[in-house]
Amino acid sequence: MGQLSFGPDILFYLGGNFMAGSTFGTLFKITTWGESHGAGVGVVVDGCPAGLSLCEDDIQKFLNRRKPGQSRYTTPRKEDDAVEILSGVFEGKTTGTPISMLVRNQNQRSKDYSEIASYYRPGHADLTFDLKYGFRDYRGGGRSSGRETIGRVAAGAIACKILDQLGIKILTYTKSIGDITADPACFDRSVIMENPFYMPDADAAKKAGEFLEECMKNEDSSGGSIECVIQNMPVGIGEPVFEKLSANLGKAILSIGAVKAFEIGDGTAVAHALGHTNNDQYTRDPDGKIIKLTNHSGGILGGISDGSDIFLRVSVKPTLRSQENSHHYKRRRQQTDFCKRPPRSGHRTACRCRR
């Protein structure tokens, strides 16, 4: 057989040296844009129906929950993260046209990143961005920065208004930080917003704080996990086979920076389960509706919502902290051994889960 030959068009199919992939969705479609140290970040939302009551305060209350500088355990970068709605809203209601939203960057401190301009940081996108595109914005990670999620949060605020009208509720909280896990028996929704980690277990939150204090003292950080519960989801959302609800949820969540794993229902625990304990048995409620006695499947069967609560779990990796005696590489590929630490790189976070 002859050897395959690839023409210049193969670069298009393999991704080329342009950055595509900033748009997600079908009916309700979002495109996030901007870099950590650019003029601003934002999102364009396409597919929002006309007539939805919407103002900047509706968006701002969501952004205020993720903005930096609210806790000693998150990045100290000070940003107001004030949203500006540029289009798609008139006299307090959506017009059905694309909604563009902007958040201006204010506290970039780009000079803090000048030392790492020619280095690849472990655990960051520095290396792959440079190898793929031949050029990268090293200031705060550029497009791979956590500030990319501002656009997602702003779009999510609109989505939540639509879902609220449909009676669909979403609850998200931190399940674990390091080895400290919220006890389901101590679940208290009222304490989620009362601790800096959004944990539903007050005792676990206290222990998480002590654990992160120790991490910070050692110039280290921690990973964690987040759980999400979607309630009142109607039956029948999702299509086999490549448009499964589970697959689309996974794509959306795994595209968030620092997310390394995604689970639905019992998730990875099913690898250790037996069939007779894992299968959700059916019964009927007093109205004759078919319901499940358990929910190991997490509310999705065959990629289609079954009407029960949808349970999601996300694993988040720790941030880069001090890496004593670690090996770094310069852009020209010379290996460099740092006996004490890599070059300092701006703002740091002890644990990402809160945001």
Indicate where each model-derived feature is located.
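Short, Lys/Arg-enriched N-terminal segments with co-localized hydrophobic residues
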Residues: Q3-F18
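N-terminal, positively charged regions that mediate nucleic acid binding
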Residues: A20-R77
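Glycine-rich anion/phosphate-binding loop at the beta-strand->alpha-helix junction
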Residues: W33, A39, E219-S222, I226-T336
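Alpha-helical support elements that line or immediately flank enzyme active sites
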Residues: A39-G51, R147-I168, E243, A247-K251, ...
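Glycine-rich, N-terminal phosphate-binding loop and its surrounding beta-alpha-beta segment
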Residues: L63-P122, D126
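A structural-propensity feature for long, helix-poor, extended segments
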Residues: G69-G88, T181-P184, V191-A202, C215-M216, ...
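Short acidic, glycine/tyrosine-flanked loop/strand segments centered on an H-E-D-like triad
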Residues: A117-G142, N325-G346
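Glycine-rich, mobile lid/loop segments that gate access to catalytic sites or pores
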Residues: L131-V241
